[in-house]
């Protein structure tokens, strides 16, 4: 039995990135031998075992053969005679197809080190096209490693385009699409996930709501970049620079989906996009099973970002109404999240990336002023029932007016 460290842990170690998970491949063993050695079986579709002490995953070396459509349509073969090289051959990218033995010796049969040095994401073998999930995985790695200068190899992009055209992407489950998108949000450049999917034609299949923003014009006076899709990528980039919150990053990416359904006769204006975007976000989140906390912030940003951009024009009553609609009294963290998205939206415009966003301060001050009005004082003054809320709002408006 020989045990090798494989995949992401080897890659990230060589890139001098933090290693969070370590996966191992076991060559020359069997399920019976693993159990006898004290390992715990956890794999459903193929033999994966947890180490008795570290609890790290150890998989028996295996080969795969395509048997049907989708990313689950594989027959798995594992036996003591499957070699390490055969196991590494089935992996997606050369930089993920390296292994290390217990002496620290690197095993790199497919040029992973070469591609790490060249900063290239390249498929291991033509079998890459058999697994549609790899399109999303490569897009995610492009987002994860873009800050280091990595790009997708032209021939790999061609295979991704082939998968996108084949109809195989439609067989991905909602959960897998969200899982890869969600992982991409934590990257240094989450916008590259969308960009790479767009470049290979996959965005139209997996996230058509975002894909249809490309080619839709906005008024050049406010949006020098004009194209709504390009604006969305720029906003995604700005959001990642402003916040580590995955909720904020997601909401920023989907806040303008309403612009994708504006009738061309109304272009380049999008008067109703804050309203029309709500149903699109709802159905997108339902379709790919986006968690409620992500959906709720996205809806709040979609509904209110235009109002917040006009903060200096709003009456105190309107500011208070916006704060109420954002539910900031019960969810105080919500205002900061929404304002970060709005600032990313404001800066996600060509040539305006460093533009200040005074609207943020205007709304924060309005919130603090309104927060300073205590409901206990209203009750102490003798107000009861519905009159408590009326008087509380009146006093909060006065506090905002006094700024």
UniProtKB/Swiss-Prot annotation:
| Cofactor(s) this protein requires | Mg(2+); Ni(2+)
- Give the E.C. number(s): 2.7.7.72, 3.1.3.-, 3.1.4.-
Task: Cite the cofactor comment.
Answer: Magnesium is required for nucleotidyltransferase activity.
Q: Which UniProt keywords apply?
A: ATP-binding, Hydrolase, Magnesium, Metal-binding, Multifunctional enzyme, Nickel, Nucleotide-binding, Nucleotidyltransferase, RNA repair, RNA-binding, Transferase, tRNA processing
The UniProt annotation places CTP binding at 8, 11, 91, 137, 140
* Binding positions (ATP): 8, 11, 91, 137, 140
Which reactions are catalysed by this chain?
Answer: a tRNA precursor + 2 CTP + ATP = a tRNA with a 3' CCA end + 3 diphosphate; a tRNA with a 3' CCA end + 2 CTP + ATP = a tRNA with a 3' CCACCA end + 3 diphosphate
Q: Show where the HD domain sits.
A: 228-329
* Recorded family membership: Belongs to the tRNA nucleotidyltransferase/poly(A) polymerase family. Bacterial CCA-adding enzyme type 1 subfamily.
PANTHER family in UniProt? MULTIFUNCTIONAL CCA PROTEIN
Quaternary organization: Monomer. Can also form homodimers and oligomers.
Anything else known: A single active site specifically recognizes both ATP and CTP and is responsible for their addition.
Q: What is known of its domains?
A: Comprises two domains: an N-terminal domain containing the nucleotidyltransferase activity and a C-terminal HD domain associated with both phosphodiesterase and phosphatase activities.
Q: Per its record, how is this protein called by name?
A: Multifunctional CCA protein
Please report the organism this UniProt entry assigns to the protein. Vibrio cholerae serotype O1 (strain ATCC 39315 / El Tor Inaba N16961)
Taxonomic placement: Bacteria, Pseudomonadati, Pseudomonadota, Gammaproteobacteria, Vibrionales
């Amino acid at each position: 039995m020989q045990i090798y460290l494989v995949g992401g842990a080897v890659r990230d170690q060589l890139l001098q990135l933090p290693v969070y998970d370590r996966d191992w491949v076991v060559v020359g063993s069997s399920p019976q031998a693993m159990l006898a050695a004290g390992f715990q079986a956890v794999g459903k579709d193929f033999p994966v075992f947890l180490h008795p002490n570290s609890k790290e995953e150890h998989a028996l070396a295996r080969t795969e053969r395509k048997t049907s459509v989708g990313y689950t349509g594989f027959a798995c073969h594992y036996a003591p005679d499957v070699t390490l090289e055969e196991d590494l051959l089935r992996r997606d990218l050369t930089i993920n197809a390296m292994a290390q033995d217990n002496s620290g010796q690197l095993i790199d049969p497919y040029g992973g080190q070469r591609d790490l040095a060249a900063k290239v994401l390249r498929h291991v073998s033509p079998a890459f096209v058999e697994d549609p999930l790899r399109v999303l995985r490569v897009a995610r790695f492009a987002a994860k490693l873009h800050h280091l200068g990595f790009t997708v190899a032209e021939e790999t992009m061609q295979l991704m385009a082939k998968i996108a055209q084949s109809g195989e992407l439609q067989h991905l489950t909602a959960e897998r699409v969200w899982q890869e998108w969600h992982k991409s949000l934590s990257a240094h450049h989450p916008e590259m996930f969308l960009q790479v999917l767009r470049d290979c034609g996959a965005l139209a299949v997996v996230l058509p709501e975002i894909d249809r923003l490309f080619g839709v014009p906005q008024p050049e006076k406010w949006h020098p970049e004009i194209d709504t899709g390009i604006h969305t990528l720029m906003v995604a980039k700005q959001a990642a620079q402003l916040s580590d919150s995955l909720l904020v990053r997601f909401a920023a990416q989907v806040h303008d989906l309403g612009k994708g359904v504006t009738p061309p006769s109304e272009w380049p204006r999008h008067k109703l996009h804050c309203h029309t975007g709500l149903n699109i976000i709802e159905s997108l989140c339902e379709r790919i099973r986006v968690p409620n906390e992500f959906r709720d912030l996205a809806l709040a940003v979609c509904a209110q970002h235009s109002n917040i951009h006009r903060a200096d024009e709003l009456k105190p009553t309107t500011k208070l109404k916006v704060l109420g609609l954002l539910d900031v009294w019960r969810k105080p963290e919500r205002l900061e999240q929404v304002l970060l998205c709005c600032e990313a939206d404001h800066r996600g415009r060509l040539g305006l990336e460093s533009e200040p966003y005074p609207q943020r301060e205007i709304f924060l001050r309005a919130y603090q002023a309104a927060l300073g009005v205590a409901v206990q004082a209203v009750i102490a003054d003798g107000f009861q029932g519905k009159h408590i809320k009326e008087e509380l709002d009146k006093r909060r408006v006065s506090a905002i007016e006094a700024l």
